Curated annotation (Swiss-Prot):
GO BP terms in the entry: glycogen biosynthetic process
Gene3D superfamilies (UniProt xref): Glycosidases, Golgi alpha-mannosidase II, Immunoglobulins
Protein name: 1,4-alpha-glucan branching enzyme GlgB
Functional note: Catalyzes the formation of the alpha-1,6-glucosidic linkages in glycogen by scission of a 1,4-alpha-linked oligosaccharide from growing alpha-1,4-glucan chains and the subsequent attachment of the oligosaccharide to the alpha-1,6 position.
Root EC class: transferase
Swiss-Prot/TrEMBL keywords: Carbohydrate metabolism, Glycogen biosynthesis, Glycogen metabolism, Glycosyltransferase, Transferase
Pfam families referenced in this protein's UniProt entry, alphabetically: Alpha-amylase, Alpha-amylase_C, CBM_48, GlgB_N
Family, similarity comment: Belongs to the glycosyl hydrolase 13 family. GlgB subfamily.
Annotated source species: Klebsiella pneumoniae subsp. pneumoniae (strain ATCC 700721 / MGH 78578)
Pathway: Glycan biosynthesis; glycogen biosynthesis
Catalytic activity, EC: 2.4.1.18
Molecular function in Gene Ontology: 1,4-alpha-glucan branching enzyme activity; cation binding; hydrolase activity, hydrolyzing O-glycosyl compounds
Residues at the active site: 405, 458
Length: 728
């Protein structure tokens, strides 16, 4: 019997409470020779085998009936490669001993991970297929600095935490182990004895695939190959490009009619992608696809940041969907949630028994609106985890843009909190300085590492410089959702037209701050839930007026400076609020031609016309690209403005937000000539009253509104028209 192993150590190993298994298990030099020790629960016979010859070189004695074996090889002085022939239940198995392999993490990786500057931590942490000393298997690593013991458990070891306790790298707080024979497709988790002695079983924070809820195990799989972003997709994200975004929740865009089940990623590739292309959108924005346990969160409470949800298929199926979108000429935007995470016990919450990823003080670490936990951005390993995740989706899946959710909740410590419910920053202010630095750092790194990919901020306050460079005090985003514009214009549109004259400024106010940020004009999922009604149902009047108002508003939206976003269903005027548990109301487009078809055709024409004319998108963020022609006609609720491209070509946009046609409506123009009606939301093609100007109107040498030439138009009721100057 070995004289080197204390009985207390054996007991601790078997009980799963020993933190340094490599100091005991494996091959060790002793005065008597090489000693091999193994913990093999339920084994009855163990031999040391020399792989080259298959010869038995020593038998291990059972020192504890619970599975601890040890044996001395007296003729051996130098460590050698060996295997173990283990008999379980009468059957012998030849295995490689995980405890004969050295440390896995390289010194540089350890240093970078500890410093929080490892750009791609997912290449090191988590589960990765590997071949070590000719043995194939999987190397596992997890950050849990305060755990007393960590084991990897899974289908390869009967989920038994005694079998594979991991090596602790004290300098980094990372636990690691190479498990021979563990292979792709197998399920696994990490079993921890936490800082307080409690047993916890956690999913891998870096898992590339996970089980679908309610199960929560991680899956071993290869790191996806890198995806390059070609020049055409980079160009499609630029400030002067036409950007029209179709925002989609994959689980409810369309469902199987027989069982209300989701479409798969591949079915969505075959149905959603060609539809979005046919409609003329340039970008698909996906509500979060990260793995999440609660359907009702719409993906905004993720537990698997690195894993596409299994609801719709495998990770490779998701890549197929992304590739299909790119092949159709659509860029893909992913909603990204670095602001908070749910408190589910299997995920990040109290990961090692301490507040590892979150703040310990609920005044900093608990989000009371959503019952979620807030990341501790000041902890380098946490910010590194998130920055690496942003790079992962762009580099490994070809995602073209990230839309960052709930930025305001990240950058303000008092967000949705009363006095006494939050802690000021070190200067006594309300700003979350660590979150601000995290966002700046993320945007800077993405700009350096993935040029052409962009980020968009959903930021609901007037924080200055969201889309300005960090060097100038900004956050470094490329685009910001203009929620103020959205609220103002919807507030205006819901009014009875007779009252709109008193709220004229709601439609013009956006231009007073238009050039402070690079704006996206969003009619998003948030505007069609929680009792807000659908966009159509917010419009006043009878059915005809509701549809006319909506069409006029869409005409205004697509002409106004800023990139465009419509949530699914808005493009055909769905009448009810969005419900994530069922399909959109596609039946509204069945049967004979109707008002919903009209709105759908209008949105398609708006998209294609918007993309065709540079004046409508080239100078969204340059004052030269916009000019009011009529801004003060509040009595008739009429607005007229010009959009302009770099070459000086103009498009005139005129909106009449009353049900009264305005005949002979004269206004001054900059460029005399013949103007063609490129789009009229009142056209019979869209189920309007078909009033207009016969397609073409000539300017007159009659002064108006301070200009020498003017146009006299018929402005249809509740309508927007676009006029394009024909070449002379």
């Amino acid at each position: 019997m070995s004289n080197h192993i204390d009985r207390d150590v054996i007991n601790a190993l078997i009980a799963g409470h020993f933190a340094d298994p490599f100091s005991v298990l494996g091959m060790h030099r002793t005065d008597a020779g090489l000693e091999v020790r193994a913990l093999l629960p339920d084994a009855t016979d163990v031999w040391v085998i020399e792989p080259k010859t298959g010869r038995k070189v020593g038998k291990l004695e059972c020192l504890d009936s619970r599975g601890f074996f040890s044996g001395v090889l007296p003729r051996r002085k130098n460590a050698f490669r060996y295997q173990l022939a283990v008999t379980w239940h009468g059957q012998q198995n030849l295995i490689d001993d995980p405890y004969r392999f050295g440390p896995l993490l390289q010194d540089l990786d350890v240093w970078l991970l500890s410093e929080g500057t490892h750009l791609r931590p997912y290449e090191t942490l988590g589960a990765h297929a590997a071949t070590m000393d000719g043995v194939t298997g999987t190397r596992f690593s997890v950050w849990a600095p305060n755990a007393r013991r960590v084991s990897v458990v899974g289908q390869f070891n009967y989920w038994d935490g005694r079998r594979h306790p991991m090596r602790f790298r004290k300098e980094s707080g990372i636990w690691e182990l190479f498990v021979p024979g563990a292979h792709n497709g197998q399920l696994y988790k990490f079993e921890l004895i936490d800082a307080h002695g409690n047993l916890r079983v956690k999913a891998d924070p870096y898992a590339f695939e996970s089980q679908m809820r309610p199960e929560s195990a991680s899956l071993i799989c290869d790191l996806p190959p890198k995806v390059e972003q070609p020049a055409d997709r980079r160009a499609a994200n630029q400030f002067d490009a036409p950007i029209s975004i179709y925002e989609v929740h994959l689980g409810s865009w369309r469902r199987h009619t027989d069982n209300n089940f989701w479409l798969s990623y591949r079915e969505l590739a075959d149905q959603l992608v060609p539809y979005a292309k046919w409609m003329g959108f340039t970008h698909l924005e996906l509500l979060p696809v990260n793995e999440h346990p609660f359907d009702g969160s719409w993906g905004y409470q993720p537990t698997g940041l690195y894993a596409p949800t299994r609801r719709f298929g495998t990770r490779d199926d998701f890549r197929y969907f992304i590739n299909a979108a790119h092949a159709a000429g659509l860029n893909v935007i992913l909603d990204w949630v670095p602001g908070h995470f749910p408190a589910d016990d299997f995920a990040l919450a109290s990961f090692d028994g301490t507040s590892l990823y979150e703040h310990s003080d609920p005044r900093e670490g608990y989000h009371q609106d959503w019952n979620t936990l807030i990341y501790n951005y000041g902890r380098r390993e946490v910010s590194n985890y998130l920055v690496g995740n942003a790079l992962y989706w762009i580099e490994r899946f070809g995602i073209d843009a990230l839309r960052v959710d709930a930025v305001a909740s990240m950058i303000y410590r008092d967000y949705s909190r009363k006095a006494g419910e939050w802690i000021p920053n070190e200067y006594g202010g309300r700003e979350n300085l660590e979150a601000i630095e995290f966002l700046r750092n993320t945007n800077r790194i993405l700009g350096e590492q993935t040029p052409g990919a962009v980020t968009m901020a959903e930021e609901s306050t007037d924080f200055a410089g969201v889309t300005r460079p960090p060097a100038g005090g900004g956050l470094g985003f490329w685009f910001k959702w203009n929620l103020g514009w959205m609220h103002d214009t919807l507030d205006y549109m819901k009014l009875d037209p007779v009252h709109r004259r008193y709220h004229h400024d709601k439609m013009t106010f956006g231009m007073l701050y238009n050039y402070t940020e690079n704006f996206v004009l969003p009619l998003s999922h948030d505007e069609v839930v929680h009792g807000k009604k659908s966009i159509l149902d917010r419009m006043p009047g009878d059915a005809w007026q509701k549809f006319a108002n909506l069409r006029a508003y869409y005409g205004w939206l697509f002409a106004f400076p800023g990139k465009k976003l419509l949530f699914m269903g808005n493009e055909f005027a769905q009448g009810r609020e969005w419900n994530h548990d069922v399909s959109l109301d596609w039946h509204l487009l069945e049967g004979g031609d109707n008002w919903h078809h009209g709105v759908q055709r209008l949105v398609r024409d708006l998209n294609h016309t918007y993309r065709h004319h540079k004046a409508l998108h080239e100078l969204d963020f340059d004052p030269y690209g916009f000019e009011w022609l009529v801004v003060d006609d509040h009595e008739r609720s009429v607005f007229v403005f010009v959009r302009r491209d770099r070459a000086g070509n103009e498009i005139i946009v005129a909106s009449n937000f009353t049900p009264v046609p305005r005949h002979d409506y004269r206004f001054g123009i900059n460029q005399p000539g013949r103007w063609r009606e490129a789009l009229n939301t009142d056209s019979m093609h869209y189920h309007g009253s078909n009033q207009g100007n016969g397609g073409v109107v000539e300017s007159d040498a009659i002064a108006s509104h301070g200009r020498e030439h003017s146009l006299s138009l018929t402005l249809p009721p509740l309508a927007t028209i676009w006029l394009v100057r024909e070449a002379q």
